[in-house]
Amino acid sequence: MMHDDPNEAGLPPDDAALPDEAADGADEVNPLHHRRIRSFVTRAGRVSTGQRRALDEFGPRFVVPYAAEIPDWDAVFGRSAPRILEIGFGMGASTAEIAAHRPGDDFLGVEVHEPGVGALLKLIGEQDLPNIRIIQHDAVEVLEHMLAPESLDGVHIFFPDPWHKARHHKRRLIQPPLVAHLASRLKPGAYLHCATDWQNYAEQMLEVLGAEPSLENTAADYAPRPDYRPITKFERRGLRLGHGVWDLVFRKRAG
């Protein structure tokens, strides 16, 4: 999930007890789930009246139920177009803005938290954005079961939870098994765009993405922010305070 101000987003303190800590060793069998890497953190969140209304009104059209099978995505979107996956869209403001400025592309947002799903549905209704669909489920399982190899034209992962304490780095989303799986779902020439405001995580991203043999960096190291990625309010505030933001854009090698 995209993180915002840690207090506003309800992030647990980094030294908080985590419910599946004891089960970390149980996932050695499936490398994609190594040490219970998930695309989300379990959090409580209140759904507002407006979000609930949007869930009821727009959910049936724009939310795709999770299923362990690959749907006909052209039928789901009502057309054949370049398809971009976003993992963890938070409250959806950036997703909506990108979709509005790229009407020729289709965007599949994966987010587990209901307030965020409701918030994006509200924006879809207000801005008439027909090129977005949402899956409210763990992105790791969506990748495994709902997306075919070489079916994506791009992947966005903006400001994933940083897990900044060293002992929790194993919980970060960007790790070799997931990156390899993401790369397998990209078409040759398609891109993977990550962004973070934690330098240590940026360094880890650069190392992990650079080690994936099917990907190549589009820059010497970090990329300039692509014009399509909006600057969030939280990011703008951080930049004013002198905090950094790092974008990484890799492409799937041809052949």
From Swiss-Prot:
S-adenosyl-L-methionine binds at E86, E111, D138, D161. PROSITE patterns: SAM_MT_TRMB. It comes from the Bacteria. This is tRNA (guanine-N(7)-)-methyltransferase. Signal peptide: none annotated. Catalyzes the formation of N(7)-methylguanine at position 46 (m7G46) in tRNA. CDD domains: AdoMet_MTases (cd02440). The active site is at D161. Pathway: tRNA modification; N(7)-methylguanine-tRNA biosynthesis.
